């Protein structure tokens, strides 16, 4: 399958959504690494079109199964009016509405949430961090609790190819990201990261969104939330969502020079984990058993390393800092602590 072009897109939309009144304006959106994404203007509403080529969109040399959009379509449909998780979705927090999915073209059409803003781009004095964090945490907690050990979800969300790619890019090479003077630290990072990456290629205990980072969380001034980018959805491990969000809150907080911004991200995280625990209820001790708590720091640490020194550095928080900068040194040190010392992450993030 060749990559879809803009000229091919409009006829496909007309076929899939015959009642859509397009205005002829199509804009390819930036910021995504995995897929090709367009905003298509319409009357009265625009829509988002997403195409998955058989490789990472920004890196054609890295093959990636375009089945990922099938998983996203399946995940979005869970929150539709007749979906199994429809009670979790409301106007305060939900994914975009799925409009159409064409597996042959690997093309997904969905609601445009352009009136909302990415979490890492909001004006912090207008978006309340406490309400936002708590609302997001409660949603993810309910999502994990409701799907916990559900055989139907386990069978329909075996997104193994994505786990293999993540292992290849994040866990397997983690010890090569950064400059390690201590051979024993490097060896421990190598072993613990590799072991986790291999274990995550199996099915886990609950549904996970799989890409819970600030650019996937869109908010407005009332703290209403829209969660986008569900192509990594998988019956996986809670740490893949909670640890992922923890890592990104930590990174955003670390690099922001403003005390107010640092406090904003800190309160966002604390409210998130409190909301998560409250929503998970009695299931929290099952979702985060001793093994999960022992391993969550590995995911947090490897996510910091791949963003500070690896292939996902460009365009994110560490991009402005040159090699040798104290910010990168501090990030590397913290990542090593989280990976090698399980209690470091447990205490730092309140698991």
Task: Map each language-model feature to its residues.
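ATP-binding pocket architecture of kinase catalytic cores
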Residues: 39-152
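Juxta-kinase regulatory segment immediately upstream of eukaryotic protein kinase catalytic domains
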Residues: 1-27
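Short, glycine/acidic-enriched loop or turn micro-motifs at the edges of active sites
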Residues: 53, 114, 214, 232, ...
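Active-site catalytic-loop/activation-segment of kinase and kinase-like phosphoryl-transfer enzymes
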Residues: 1-6, 108, 142-148, 152-198, ...
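ATP/Mg2+ or Mg2+-diphosphate-binding catalytic cores
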Residues: 287, 298-351
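Active-site acidic catalytic loop and adjacent metal/ATP-binding pocket
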Residues: 27-42, 47-49, 194-240
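Active-site activation/catalytic loop segments of kinase-like enzymes and analogous catalytic loops
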Residues: 74, 239-282, 300-319
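A glycine-centered beta->alpha junction motif in the catalytic cores
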Residues: 51-58, 110-126, 145, 174, ...
């Amino acid at each position: 399958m060749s990559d879809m072009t803009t000229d091919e897109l409009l006829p496909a939309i007309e076929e899939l959504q015959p009642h859509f009144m397009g205005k002829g304006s199509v804009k390819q959106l930036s910021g995504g690494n995995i897929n090709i994404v367009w905003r298509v203007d319409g009357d009265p509403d625009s829509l988002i079109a997403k195409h998955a080529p058989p490789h990472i969109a920004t890196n054609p040399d890295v093959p990636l199964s375009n089945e990922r959009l099938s998983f996203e379509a399946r995940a979005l449909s869970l929150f539709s009016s007749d979906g199994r998780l429809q009670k979790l979705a409301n106007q305060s927090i939900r994914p975009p509405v799925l409009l159409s999915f064409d597996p042959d073209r690997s093309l997904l059409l969905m609601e445009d949430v352009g009136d909302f803003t990415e979490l890492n781009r909001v004006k912090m004095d207008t978006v309340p961090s406490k309400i936002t964090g708590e609302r997001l945490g409660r949603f993810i907690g309910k999502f994990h609790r409701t799907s916990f050990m559900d055989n139907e979800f386990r069978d329909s969300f075996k997104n193994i190819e994505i786990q293999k790619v993540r292992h290849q890019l994040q866990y397997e090479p983690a010890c090569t990201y950064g400059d390690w003077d201590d051979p024993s630290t490097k060896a421990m990072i190598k072993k613990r990261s590799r072991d986790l990456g291999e274990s995550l290629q199996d099915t886990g205990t609950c549904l996970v969104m799989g890409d819970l980072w600030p650019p996937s969380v869109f908010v407005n001034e009332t703290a209403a939330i829209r969660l986008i980018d569900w192509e990594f959805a998988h019956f996986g491990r809670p740490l893949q969502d909670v640890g992922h969000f923890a890592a990104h809150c930590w990174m955003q907080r670390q690099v922001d020079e403003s005390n107010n911004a640092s406090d904003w991200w800190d309160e966002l995280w604390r409210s998130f984990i409190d909301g998560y625990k409250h929503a998970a209820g009695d299931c929290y001790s099952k979702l985060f058993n001793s093994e999960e708590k022992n391993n969550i720091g590995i995911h947090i640490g490897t996510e910091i390393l791949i963003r500070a020194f690896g292939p996902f550095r460009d365009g994110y928080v560490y991009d402005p800092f040159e090699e040798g900068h104290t910010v990168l040194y501090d990030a590397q040190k913290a990542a090593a602590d989280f990976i090698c010392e399980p209690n470091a992450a447990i205490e730092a993030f309140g698991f």
